Regions:
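A beta-strand edge to alpha-helix "cap/lid" segment located at domain peripheries
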Residues: 4, 53, 59-120
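Short, flexible active-site loop motifs that bind/organize anionic cofactors or intermediates
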Residues: 14, 18, 42, 99
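Short acidic-aromatic low-complexity motifs
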Residues: 2-34
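A solvent-exposed, acidic/Ser-Thr-rich amphipathic alpha-helical stretch
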Residues: 25-77
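Residues at structural and domain junctions
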Residues: 13-14, 38-41, 88
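Short charge-dense sequence patches
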Residues: 1-11, 48-52, 109
Length: 120
């Protein structure tokens, strides 16, 4: 399946906001390449769908009620793009913010670079 960069950026936020492990894994299998890499500035590098699933689940377990919301439209350039987002409990002020940069290959995410930002 081939996805646009904008869709991939938004669906990546869904992965980290999903509480149901089976649904999260289904999205991971759909939007990430088998050899994908996730660069987390605080926790290191995660390689492959299994590791991305594991870290997304671990993050969600520490903040089960947090959701990720884009704060601007995605920026796209060639096979890459970025999206700025905030995360927190619905109905409350955001707890933290970040920017995800992705590189896509054949309609799937091959790499995600996470940057934490100051709250807007």
């Amino acid at each position: 399946m081939s996805n646009s960069i904008s869709i991939l950026l938004r669906r990546n936020l869904d992965v980290f906001g999903e509480n149901d492990p089976a649904r999260r894994r289904a999205v991971i299998d759909e939007i990430f390449t088998e050899d994908c890499v996730f660069y987390d500035p605080n926790n290191g590098i995660y390689r492959g769908r299994d590791e991305i699933d594991r870290i997304a689940g671990a993050i969600k377990a520490t903040r089960p009620d947090f959701q990720y919301q884009p704060i601007v439209e995605p920026d796209v350039s060639g096979d890459g793009g970025r999206i700025q987002w905030v995360s927190g409990r619905p109905g409350e002020a955001p707890a933290y913010a970040g920017t995800d940069f992705i590189v896509a290959r054949e309609g799937r995410i091959a790499a995600v670079y996470l940057f934490f930002d100051k709250l807007p």
